[in-house]
Amino acid sequence: MARQLSRKVPLAELHCHLGGAVTPAIMWSIAHAQGIKLPTRDYWEFRDTITVSDKRNRSFDGYLQLFHWTELIQSSPIAVERAVYEVVGGAYRKNNVTTTELRFNPMKRNRGGEQDLDHIIAAAARGMDRASLEYPVKPGLIFCLDRAFPFELNEIIVEKAIAWRDRGVVGVDIAGPESATFRVADYRRLFRRARQYGLGLTVHTGESGPVDEVARVVELLEPDRIGHGVKAAYDPRAMAMIRERGIVLEICPSSNLNTRVVSGWEEFRWIFDQFRRNEVRFTINTDGPEMLKTYIRDEMASLGRYGILSVEDQEQAAATSLAASFVPNVSDVPAARMEPATRVAVEREEA
């Protein structure tokens, strides 16, 4: 009996961070093209620096530290354009991902103000345009606010998202680890403003923070989707609110295992069982395919192999991803003419 989704089924990746989505070989090339001083001159050591590894302790903080170098390397218009172009095109070639929503914080790509923010955003839009000319894809950008940022900086990010909404910016997000200065209620007005201008709303919650934050985010910010959200399975009230409001979860299995937010596949089995029982809609994503060394079909395959999601469940998750995408008219994208490359073939190409 088949346990894996057909590779011909088109997919939408809704939760993918630009800092974790570019192959190490391309990151190496971008860094050298800009003359960035790297922590090592050895490519293989560099690859280990920006990807998960058994040599590194698995933790939420450890995972976030990987983004130090990737965000620095991507901090110029030229770097951002190439990064976005490579991710969108690569996702289609490797996994038949026809809709990629790439999220990033533009203020973490402008070297603390040295680079003009609008030039960074324009470069990301050009990267999407190039990929869309070459492949039958419909990408979009989500701008991440940061819990550690002062409100004034996050407000600027929302205003930039509104200003660039006609050039492929489709939503806003709140990301980053817990911060003593961050209050969900402070962002209610900002999120309402973003919604008024047609932007999709998603929030990282139910991951590293407290279980009760999920319900608080749903109540105060009224998001369309929730990034990760696995801890909602432990809160019946949160699941009821999510179901009643039609909110969709962006589940990233390998990421949650790597950060130890979820202890193992057996806990995931229980989590998905709770979501199905409570009619909570969910999608499957990578969080960062190259950083985590996994593609979206790898995630689906693992859930099928462990008997957590049936092929029908996987097909439903894929359909939900397309339906819940912030990118307009994603159903207009034609299906792939050939099957995507296997993971082995891609790794050989990179090496």
Residues covered by each model-derived region:
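Metal-cofactor-binding active-site regions of metalloenzymes
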Residues: 1-199, 207-225, 231-248, 253-351
